[in-house]
Amino acid sequence: MYCVQCEQTMVTPMGNGCSFGQGMCGKTAETSDLQDLLIACLHSLSAWALKAREHGIINHDADNFAPRAFFATLTNVNFDSNRIVGYAQQAIIYRNELIKAISEVEPNPELNHPLAHIELKGISIDQLAEQAKEFALDTDRAEIGEEVHGVRLLALYGLKGAAAYLEHAYVLGKFDNDLYVEYHGFMAWLGTKPSDLNELLEKSLAIGSMNFKVMAMLDAGETETFGNPVPATVNIRPVKGKCILISGHDLKDLKELLEQTEGKGINVYTHGEMLPAHGYPELKKYKHLVGNYGSGWQNQQKEFARFPGAIVMTSNCLIDPNVGDYADRIFTCNIVGWPGVVHLEKHNFAPVIEKALECDGFPYTELEHYITVGFGRKTLIDASDAVIDLVKAGKLSHVFVIGGCDGDKEERHYYTDLAYALPKDTAVLTLGCGKYRFNKLDFGTIDGGLPRLLDAGQCNDTYSAIMLAVTLSQKLGIGLNELPLSIVLSWFEQKAIIVLLTLLALGVKNVYSGPSKPAFLNDNVMNLLHEKFGLSGLTTPEQDFGHIINK
C-alpha cells in the first residue's frame, strides 16, 4: 500500500503516506492497491478512447464510465474491494470494445502507450491484489526524485477531483465531448509516467483550466435542473417525527428521495455538502425537507450514531459506519461503497424508507435555530453593484473567501478564529464543508443590508465565487489580483486540489492554503509554487490577516 492523497495521511520522519495494513481513512491495503490497478486500467481506456477518436469513433458509455470509476478512488468514497475490481473489469471491457471498433477501420491497430494492453491477471481479489503491486504510485519514486514524484501526483489528484465534477455534471444530464477529449488526454498522458517537472507543472495548470469549464457545466446542470439558488434560512434543530438523513453532493438523489418520501410522514434532513440544497427553488419547495443536521463529515460517527433514522450517502465523505454501530441503517448509492453496507441501485430508495419507518425518529421538536444559505452565482452577481457601492463608500474593506474541505485536525480551528476575528467592515464568502467551522456563528450585516457571511454552496461552487470576482473586476476596471478579495483555502482531498489548480490556472495569486501542506509536495515544490503563484501556507490568523491587508 502507498497512498498519500489526503491531508490525514501518515507523515513520519521515515516518509509520508499510508503504507501499512490500513490507511488513516480506514481503507485497507488491499482496497488501496486495487484502486491503483483500477487507475492503470483507466489510463489504458483513455489512451484507446483517444485513438478511437482519430477514426471518429466515440463510445459514450466508455466516456461516462471513465471519470465515474476514477471518482471511486477519491478519498472516503469507495472502500469495497469487490466494487473496485468490478470497475477495473469494466474498464478493460470498454477498452477492448474500442480496440475492436478501431480494428474494423484499422486492422491490427497499434498504440504506443505502456499500458495499452494491460490485462487483469486473474479474477480473485487475492490474484488481482498481487498484480496491483506493480502499479503502486511510488514504483519509480527513488528514480525520478521527490519533486517530480510530487508534481506528478499533484496532476493525478487534480484530475481525480475534476473527474468527480465531470460525474456530478453527467448525472444532471450535462456532457461535453470536448471536455471528455481533454480528460482522456490528461489521463492517457499520466499513464506514461511523465517525468519532466516543467511539463508536469504546465499540465497541472491545464487540468485546472479544464476544470473551470467542468465547473461551469456543473453549475449549468444544477441551476437548469433546480433553479438558481436564492437566500433561504435553514433550521438546524431536529423536528419531531420519522427521519432520513442524506449526505454527499448529488442533488438529483435528494430530489428523487424527496419525491419518493412525499406524503409518507418522513422528514428529510441534509448533511454536510447537501446543505446548499435548501437554497434551490425546486428542492426547497418540498415541505418535508425540514432542515440540516450535524456538522463536518469528520464528526459523522458520533452524529450518525445519534440520528434516529435512516442515512444515505450519495458521494464522499464516508467513514467506517461500524464504529458508531449504524451500519444497518446507512445506505450507499452511486460510486460510494463500504463492505456489508446495502448499496442502492437506480434511485430506488424503498429500503431507506422502510428502515426510516422502523426507526424511532426524533421524539420532540427542539427550539429552532436558523442559518442562511443560497448565495449562488446569480445572487452574488446581482449583488455586485451593491458590493461596489459599499467598497466605494468605505463600508466594505475586504472580502475573504474562506472555504474548502473540513477535517479533524485541531489546527483547523484556525478557520474559525480567522473568520470570527475579521473586522466588521469585511465579509466572508464561504463554500464547501469547511464552512461548518463557523457557519453557525452570527456575523451580522454591513450597513444593515449585506450579510457578512455569504454561503455560496458546495466546493464546486467555487465557480460562483470566481464569477463574482470576474464581475467585480470588469465593473471596477481592475485585475483579479487587485480586488480587495483574498482566498484562504481549507484542503483535505482531491476536490480541493483541483479547486486550487483551477484558481492558479486562472491567474489568481496569493492564495493561502492549509492547515498543512500536502504530504506529497516537499518544501522545494512548495517554495516553487510560492515563487510562481504566491501560494502560502498558514501561520496564525492574526499574522496572516495582517499580511493580507498590508499587501
From Swiss-Prot:
<dbReference type="GO" id="GO:0046872">
    <property type="term" value="F:metal ion binding"/>
</dbReference>
<feature type="modified residue" description="Cysteine persulfide">
    <location>
        <position position="405"/>
    </location>
</feature>
<feature type="binding site">
    <location>
        <position position="495"/>
    </location>
    <ligand>
        <name>hybrid [4Fe-2O-2S] cluster</name>
    </ligand>
</feature>
<comment type="function">
    <text>Catalyzes the reduction of hydroxylamine to form NH(3) and H(2)O.</text>
</comment>
<dbReference type="InterPro" id="IPR010048">
    <property type="entry name" value="Hydroxylam_reduct"/>
</dbReference>
<dbReference type="GO" id="GO:0005737">
    <property type="term" value="C:cytoplasm"/>
</dbReference>
<dbReference type="GO" id="GO:0004601">
    <property type="term" value="F:peroxidase activity"/>
</dbReference>
<keyword id="KW-0479">Metal-binding</keyword>
<feature type="binding site">
    <location>
        <position position="249"/>
    </location>
    <ligand>
        <name>hybrid [4Fe-2O-2S] cluster</name>
    </ligand>
</feature>
<feature type="binding site">
    <location>
        <position position="317"/>
    </location>
    <ligand>
        <name>hybrid [4Fe-2O-2S] cluster</name>
    </ligand>
</feature>
<dbReference type="GO" id="GO:0051537">
    <property type="term" value="F:2 iron, 2 sulfur cluster binding"/>
</dbReference>
<feature type="binding site">
    <location>
        <position position="25"/>
    </location>
    <ligand>
        <name>[2Fe-2S] cluster</name>
    </ligand>
</feature>
<dbReference type="Pfam" id="PF03063">
    <property type="entry name" value="Prismane"/>
</dbReference>
<feature type="binding site">
    <location>
        <position position="459"/>
    </location>
    <ligand>
        <name>hybrid [4Fe-2O-2S] cluster</name>
    </ligand>
</feature>
<dbReference type="InterPro" id="IPR004137">
    <property type="entry name" value="HCP/CODH"/>
</dbReference>
<feature type="binding site">
    <location>
        <position position="6"/>
    </location>
    <ligand>
        <name>[2Fe-2S] cluster</name>
    </ligand>
</feature>
<feature type="binding site">
    <location>
        <position position="493"/>
    </location>
    <ligand>
        <name>hybrid [4Fe-2O-2S] cluster</name>
    </ligand>
</feature>
<keyword id="KW-0408">Iron</keyword>
<keyword id="KW-0411">Iron-sulfur</keyword>
<comment type="similarity">
    <text>Belongs to the HCP family.</text>
</comment>
<protein>
    <recommendedName>
        <fullName>Hydroxylamine reductase</fullName>
        <ecNumber>1.7.99.1</ecNumber>
    </recommendedName>
</protein>
<dbReference type="GO" id="GO:0042542">
    <property type="term" value="P:response to hydrogen peroxide"/>
</dbReference>
<keyword id="KW-0560">Oxidoreductase</keyword>
<feature type="binding site">
    <location>
        <position position="273"/>
    </location>
    <ligand>
        <name>hybrid [4Fe-2O-2S] cluster</name>
    </ligand>
</feature>
<dbReference type="GO" id="GO:0050418">
    <property type="term" value="F:hydroxylamine reductase activity"/>
</dbReference>
<dbReference type="InterPro" id="IPR016100">
    <property type="entry name" value="Prismane_a-bundle"/>
</dbReference>
<dbReference type="InterPro" id="IPR016099">
    <property type="entry name" value="Prismane-like_a/b-sand"/>
</dbReference>
<keyword id="KW-0001">2Fe-2S</keyword>
<feature type="binding site">
    <location>
        <position position="3"/>
    </location>
    <ligand>
        <name>[2Fe-2S] cluster</name>
    </ligand>
</feature>
<dbReference type="InterPro" id="IPR011254">
    <property type="entry name" value="Prismane-like_sf"/>
</dbReference>
<keyword id="KW-0963">Cytoplasm</keyword>
<feature type="binding site">
    <location>
        <position position="18"/>
    </location>
    <ligand>
        <name>[2Fe-2S] cluster</name>
    </ligand>
</feature>
<feature type="binding site">
    <location>
        <position position="433"/>
    </location>
    <ligand>
        <name>hybrid [4Fe-2O-2S] cluster</name>
    </ligand>
</feature>
<feature type="binding site" description="via persulfide group">
    <location>
        <position position="405"/>
    </location>
    <ligand>
        <name>hybrid [4Fe-2O-2S] cluster</name>
    </ligand>
</feature>
